[in-house]
Amino acid sequence: MSTDLKLTPIRDSNCTLCPLGGMASSERDVCRVGSEPTPYLIVTKNPPSEKMKDEIFSYLEEVGFSRDDFSFTAAVKCRVWDANITKTMTKTCANEYLSQEVQRHKYKWILAFGNEALQATAGKAQVTKYRAQVHPCTHRSETKVFPTIAPGAVSRNPGQRASFIADLTYFRTLSEDAGGTSKRLPDRIRMITSPTGLKALRDDLLTCDGFAFDIETNGFNEYEADSQVVSLALSTWDKGATEPQRCYAVPLEHPESAFRGRSREVLEVLGKYMGTPKRRVAHNGKFDLRWLHEFGCHFDLTFDTMLAAHLLDENRAKGLKPLARSLLNVPPWEMETKALQDEDLKKVLKYNALDTWYTAHLYFIFRDQLVNEQPRLGKLMQMMSVPASNIFTEIERKGIWVDREILQTNAKIAEETLADIDSKLMAHVPHRDEWPDNLKEVNFNASNFARWLLFEHLGLPVIARGKDKEDGSPGNPSMAEGVLQMLNKRHPHEVLDLLLSRVKWQKFSSSFFSSYLDQIDDNDRIHTTFKLTGTVTGRLSSGKGDADKVTGRVSNRGVNLQQVPRDKFVKGVFGGAPGHVFLECDYSQVELRVAAAIAREPTMISLYQNNEDIHMATAMKMTGKPASQVTGDERKKAKPVNFGFLYGMSANTFVDTAWNNYGVEVTPHEAEVFRRAYFEQFPKLLDWHRRQRALAQKFGRVESPLGRVRHLPDIYSPDRKVAAEAGRQAINSPVQSFASDLAILALVNITRDFKRKGLKAFSVGAVHDALNFEVPEDEVRIAAPLIKYHMENVPLMKHFGYHMPVPILGDVALSRYWGDKEEVPEDILLDEGKFDKWLKSHGL
């Protein structure tokens, strides 16, 4: 069978089936098909280009197909790539030609890429809903259709690549009856409907070696009044097993459940035994444990397949369904989860049970990889990821305390201030007769009205523009906050002052206070979500949706604590509940310290070992002055120099970064001088940059000192920009992941020490390089030094065999409110008498 492709001209260049017919001609060929009949037909929206054809083939070959297996055709035969082709046209018009092809060649399977292809071949819409499922072909009953997203969607969003490959892998299993590693369904799902069934489950929990569990709920927030657990499922196994052996499903708050109205009682009983087995596994178990703990079922995880999947390959999709498709070759088991209590009970229980069954299979795969193939990652999983997940379960349940009265007062002030700003801005708006015809209403946001007001009516100069328009004309004048700040510095104007102030107060009002007022609970606390798998570097993220947990439902639980502004007006609404103190311990220059260690840069290491000021040292190098003559502004400029050039930033990029991130104005010439001086002072950083890029080129990955891996397949991209970005990630990823892992390891040790000492202090979260705590007033004298000690003394050598050549320092600050926190000098913190006086002098 030939792999050559031939081109077939359009059937009828004078076609009038749809409005696109008049655009067609016979000058070019439009439909690509194999030169001989093939078992599989690929259908795309439009005829694929040669580049896209080769890209599709590379995906198919990756999962084990041959090019000889496929023909190509298009749902739409017209050459007009930018035409507004509707699904109706695809279904009612273009199908006439497609139907002839399918019937003539008698294809066994159609691989439909994208919505239009799915519509044309199976008569269905929403490829995201029907992907990776088998559908009958509307043109030939013997032909089966397997839809997935279009390759172009993967090109636009590389994050979808893993799930796309998972779909193709499953398609190969189905179409070739490959079998392979496909995992069988459980022989039986034991649906527990009586006390006798609960007793049988209890007996299994008392003797089994481990289990995987999952719950189905009626929402995302366990603390809400109407929250209910719809069902609980478990898959268990005995010691020495290599796959799950038994599967249970317990109906709870479902109309057809025998335990309806008694779910808390059932969960409390099961909770007495679920902590007994040595291995307790879930996929994104933090979600499940929040709910189970809320309903009296208390135990901790020992393994989480989502955490393991992320550690082993941070680039792949981490949802249970795509992992099961790609690693287990199992059929989809999707269902609509928005209203489970309205669904048939048996359907819900089967869905719930299969979640646990395949989670258990993934557990055995990942456990083997972490123990036998990637033991350093296994150590991170054991020492950090799983314990941290259990800790964040409780952090998320408790939430962070908010002073409701201050919140309401500040929200009102923000609204009034915003209204006052708008009133003052209106004084600068000319009469409606002077407006251009295209402007219909006043809009002080980044709008055409605001651009006209600034750059035409007021005549302020344009110092930056957006991207050029499609017709080649210059882009619109930029209204970015940093650009307006720079413009105001160069050309001060009251309107610019007001607009910049408006940006600030609008954020306060809409992005923060409005959200906080909606989310504060009856206990004056706001709950959020912390993601240990939210970034490819491993850095903790906050406030993400729980979409990985339940397909089809997204909930932004609480605030993103990482984005709470430093401004006291916002930060000051958070604090310690009555009788408590808010404490923050922040790592000092941790990325610079970690980079110095990884790069083995002797000058940086020496500065930190001698407790010298690295920003002052850099300022001295930049200016050629002794420390006594360096001005405050010169030292201020050294800070962005140290953090900006650390990873090899260009001088041009530094100009924007220094202004946008640090408010420091630097000329292009100064940036060049600073960059040269920086690497003259720390020359080994350049050697480190080259070393990291070389490692990425050789292995396609780099590692942190603790063994966390950053896979960088883009380092081999023919696109120079893409490859260059991968090279930059090879440098900064190990630093950022190591710094983040230090904080999480410290949190694990702090929490354990709290429990050992019987302290009631607890963490309320982590923000960047800092850990935040709520501490009872009578425990501050014990907890504060303890927190600082553990942040500065993570046992890296003991657990990971790594010696840190520079000291890691943590600065403790505390107050009633987050926005009022004040740093406690180390000599005072570590002296019980001095610390006691300091606390009393601060009213604590």
Show where each model-derived region lies.
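Metal-dependent phosphoesterase core characteristic of DEDDh/y 3'-5' exonuclease domains
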Residues: 37, 57, 61, 122-132, ...
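Conserved "right-hand" nucleotidyltransferase catalytic core of DNA-directed polymerases
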Residues: 173-253, 276, 315, 327, ...
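A common structural junction motif
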Residues: 789-800
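Conserved catalytic core of nucleic-acid polymerases
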Residues: 390-397, 461, 489-492, 527-528, ...
